[in-house]
UniProtKB/Swiss-Prot annotation:
GO terms for molecular function: ATP binding; tRNA dimethylallyltransferase activity. The gene is miaA. PANTHER family: TRNA DIMETHYLALLYLTRANSFERASE. Monomer. Its EC number is 2.5.1.75. The record marks S103, R124 as: Interaction with substrate tRNA. Pfam families: IPPT. Substrate binds at T10, G11, T12, G13, K14, S15. This is tRNA dimethylallyltransferase. It catalyses: adenosine(37) in tRNA + dimethylallyl diphosphate = N(6)-dimethylallyladenosine(37) in tRNA + diphosphate.
Length: 305
C-alpha cells in the first residue's frame, strides 16, 4: 500500500484529519499512523507538543511516538531510518501508512530519501564549544559570513542547526543547502496533502491552543521533566513552550509568563513551516475549515494508489 502524508503548519488539525481518514478507510483496509513531529518523539512531552493521548487515537496504531528520553538528542537521520522501516512494515501488512506531522526536515528527509552529509564528532564538538563561548547570536553571524543563504534560512536562536550548518560547510567545502534533498517523485509514490488555514484564523487557533496548554498543566509537565533531565537534553529543552517555561522558571517566575513568548514563537515557526512546505509543488493543499477534506484527501490518495 502506498502511503499518505498529511503535512503543514502547527495547529492546523493534521492529526484529526488523519484519524478521520483512517476511520473512513477502516471498513475496507487497515491504517496505521507514523508521526513526523520531532518533539512528539519524546516520552513525557505530551501537553506542549499536543500529542494525542492513547484514548483519543480511536484505536489506530501510532508509530514514532514516545521513543526517546528527554536526555537523548533527536536526529533526522535516526528518524528517517526508523520511520522508513515502520512505513515499509505497515505496507507489507497490507495496511495504509499515514505520515502525519509538520517537522520540516523530518518530513522531507523521509519522503525524499535524503542522503545525509558526513558528520565528524570532533568538528561538531568544536562548533558546540564555540557556541558556548560566544552565544547563539554571534555564531549565527559567523555562519552568515561563510554561508549567507544558510544563515537566512536558520533562525538566529536555533543553535543546534547553526552548529550543524557550520559543520557541514567545514566538512564539505560547500554551502549547507548543497546537501539538501532535491524535490522529485516522492518516495513510495506517497500522496502528499497539505493542511492550512487563513493566517488570521490560524493565529486565533494558535492562541487558543497555547492557552489550553498552559491551562492543562504545561508548567507542571516541564517541572516533572526537569527531574528526568530535561535541562540536559540538547533538543528537548529547546522545544517550543518548554524552552520558554524553562527560561521563566530560571528567571524566578512561576512559568505563567512563558505563555506570550510561546505564542509568538509558535507563530514565527508557522511562518517558517509555510515557507518550507509551500515550495513543494507535489503538495495538494486543503483549507483546514473545509467540510469535505476527508473526501478530497481520499481522492488524492486513490489517484496515486
Amino acid at each position: 500500500m502506498r502511503p499518505l502524508a498529511i503535512i503543514g503548519p502547527t495547529g492546523t488539525g493534521k492529526s484529526a484529519l488523519a484519524l478521520d481518514v483512517a476511520e473512513r478507510l477502516g471498513g475496507e483496509i487497515g491504517v496505521e499512523i507514523v508521526n513526523a513531529d520531532a518533539m512528539q518523539l519524546y516520552r513525557g512531552m505530551d501537553i506542549g507538543t499536543a500529542k494525542l493521548p492513547a484514548a483519543q487515537r480511536r484505536g489506530v496504531p501510532h508509530h514514532q511516538l514516545d521513543v526517546l528520553d528527554v536526555t537523548e538528542t533527536a536526529s533526522v537521520a535516526r528518524y528517517q531510518s526508523e520511520a522508513a522501516r515502520d512505513i515499509e512494515a505497515i505496507a507489507a501488512r497490507g495496511a495504509v501508512p499515514i505520515i502525519v506531522g509538520g517537522s520540516m526536515m523530518y518530513v522531507q528527509a523521509l519522503l525524499d530519501d535524503w542522503a545525509f552529509p558526513a558528520t565528524d564528532p570532533a568538528v561538531r564538538a568544536r562548533w558546540e564549544q564555540r557556541l558556548a563561548e560566544v552565544g547563539v547570536a554571534a555564531l549565527h553571524g559567523e555562519l552568515g559570513k561563510v554561508d549567507p543563504d544558510a544563515a537566512a534560512s536558520i533562525l538566529p536562536t536555533d543553535g543546534r542547526r547553526i552548529v550543524r550548518a557550520l559543520e557541514v560547510v567545514e566538512l564539505t567545502g560547500q554551502p549547507f543547502a548543497a546537501s539538501a534533498p532535491t524535490i522529485g517523485a516522492p518516495r513510495w509514490d506517497t500522496a502528499i496533502i497539505g493542511l492550512d488555514w487563513e493566517t488570521t484564523v490560524l493565529d486565533e487557533r494558535l492562541a487558543a491552543r497555547t492557552d489550553s496548554m498552559f491551562a492543562e498543566g504545561l508548567v507542571a509537565e516541564v517541572a516533572g521533566l526537569l527531574r528526568h533531565g530535561l535541562r540536559e537534553g540538547v533538543t528537548a529543552s529547546r522545544a517550543l513552550g518548554y524552552a520558554q517555561v524553562l527560561a521563566d522558571l530560571d528567571a524566578g517566575g512561576d512559568g505563567s509568563a512563558a505563555r506570550e513568548p510561546t505564542f509568538v514563537g509558535t507563530r514565527r515557526y508557522v511562518r517558517r513551516q509555510r515557507s518550507w512546505f509551500r515550495r513543494d509543488h507535489r503538495v495538494c493543499w486543503l483549507d483546514g475549515g473545509s467540510p469535505d477534506n476527508v473526501d478530497r484527501t481520499l481522492r488524492a490518495w486513490r489517484a496515486v494508489s
